[in-house]
Amino acid sequence: MRLERTSFARRLEGYTEAVSLPAQPVVEGRLLRMVGLTLEAEGLQAAVGSRCNVINESGYHPVQVEAEVMGFSGSKVYLMPVGSLAGIAPGARVVPLPDTGRLPMGMSMLGRVLDGAGRALDGKGGMRAEDWVPMDGPTINPLKRHPISEPLDVGIRSINGLLTVGRGQRLGLFAGTGVGKSVLLGMMTRFTRADIIVVGLIGERGREVKEFIDEILGEEGLKRSVVVASPADDAPLMRLRAAQYCTRIAEYFRDKGKNVLLLMDSLTRYAQAQREIALAIGEPPATKGYPPSVFAKLPKLVERAGNAEAGGGSITAFYTVLSEGDDQQDPIADAARGVLDGHFVLSRRLAEEGHYPAIDIEASISRVMPQVVEAEHLRDAQRFKQLWSRYQQSRDLISVGAYVAGGDPETDLAIARFPVMRQFLRQGLDESESLAESRARLASLLAGGQA
């Protein structure tokens, strides 16, 4: 009962702020036209980012659609709808909504599947909110952030041993389609040692959303997770909100002192949603059709993850980045690499060979690994990569029998150790290996390979 009273009191705080503002008349506008995804209204007094209801009462069944103000030109205001526009006609009323855009938060979110507006998608009814918070969280002074100094055990041998992740790090999973991104995210969800896991499924096929929750995440993984899903058929504004909402959830729990794992699939769909919105309101395209606002929004989203101030919680974030045609120079992939603390590249060649997880350790890097592991561990990881790379350089010669043993001691050693190195990099979907076990296995592998 005490919890309910506390929750009710906190919820009232948001309404208190709204009603304490001086009362002003609501100035409605009228819908002039709709071009593509954009609504154009006139006679409206609303700031960019504010919400409105577009109401058509002329038909047999009144229609009401929520929209957000995205821009203006003179007396005209441009809005982007959140839902379907079926039934909206010229002359529809555009009514500004009071600024009560607060979202429900609380421990009751664990095990739930929500949309970008905080509504339940799992059929389990509404949540018991402990707090109501705005979509945009407070920014942290970069000089006050606690530095990344502690390793995070993700339960995946190749990452723990060779690409060690630090608690509070932000990484990208770069890959084309069908090489095991979602499966790798599912393994991280089940095996990572984190207090709370927040999963954002942005712009994925509806079928994949259910498959990820039921088969990859599983019942045990869902118990300590919050899933925010916005399928590909959602409006671009809803996809954008879903990415921001799951980040806000992670921030909320970090501010409560929790160590949070944030998994977002995918950052590319977030950028594409912003591209749809920007082009619809007339922003000129730039690199490969992406307007400048896309590249401005990426760091704003990513920078919200990371460590809090000393003594607080952390957000370790993994963002998947789709590389069109496996092109690592895709503009979104290139921009993401510049704002992330490392990247894991998934190789189609390895996936086709049945090598899972298909992490290309030569093309991947964890920029904070030197700060979170011992010097001996770092040397072993570098030595492993040297031997693996030496074998890959001579792979064609070895496969056709053109390499003569004894020609190069390093290549001879790489050939001798290749079977155990390949076994080290492979891992079953239900197999977990701790950071300490991965470290010991790496040291043992290299000790056996050095005469």
Swiss-Prot record:
Enzyme class: translocase
Domain of life: Bacteria
Compartments where found: Cytoplasm
UniProtKB keywords: ATP synthesis, ATP-binding, Bacterial flagellum biogenesis, Bacterial flagellum protein export, Cytoplasm, Hydrogen ion transport, Ion transport, Nucleotide-binding, Protein transport, Translocase, Transport
GO CC term (a single one): cytoplasm
Primary localization class, coarse: cytoplasm
Keyword NADP in record: no
GO BP terms, alphabetized: bacterial-type flagellum assembly; bacterial-type flagellum-dependent cell motility; protein secretion by the type III secretion system; proton motive force-driven ATP synthesis; proton transmembrane transport
Substrates-to-products reaction catalysed: ATP + H2O + 4 H(+)(in) = ADP + phosphate + 5 H(+)(out)
InterPro entries recorded: AAA+_ATPase (IPR003593), ATPase_a/bsu_AS (IPR020003), ATPase_alpha/beta_chains (IPR050053), ATPase_F1/V1/A1_a/bsu_nucl-bd (IPR000194), ATPase_T3SS_FliI/YscN (IPR005714), FliI_clade1 (IPR020005), P-loop_NTPase (IPR027417), T3SS_ATPase_C (IPR040627)
Binding site for ATP: 175-182
UniProt-recorded Gene Ontology molecular function terms: ATP binding; ATP hydrolysis activity
PROSITE patterns in the record: ATPASE_ALPHA_BETA
EC nos: 7.1.2.2
Pfam families: ATP-synt_ab, T3SS_ATPase_C
Primary role: Probable catalytic subunit of a protein translocase for flagellum-specific export, or a proton translocase involved in local circuits at the flagellum.
Family affiliation: Belongs to the ATPase alpha/beta chains family.
Record protein name field: Flagellum-specific ATP synthase
Gene: fliI
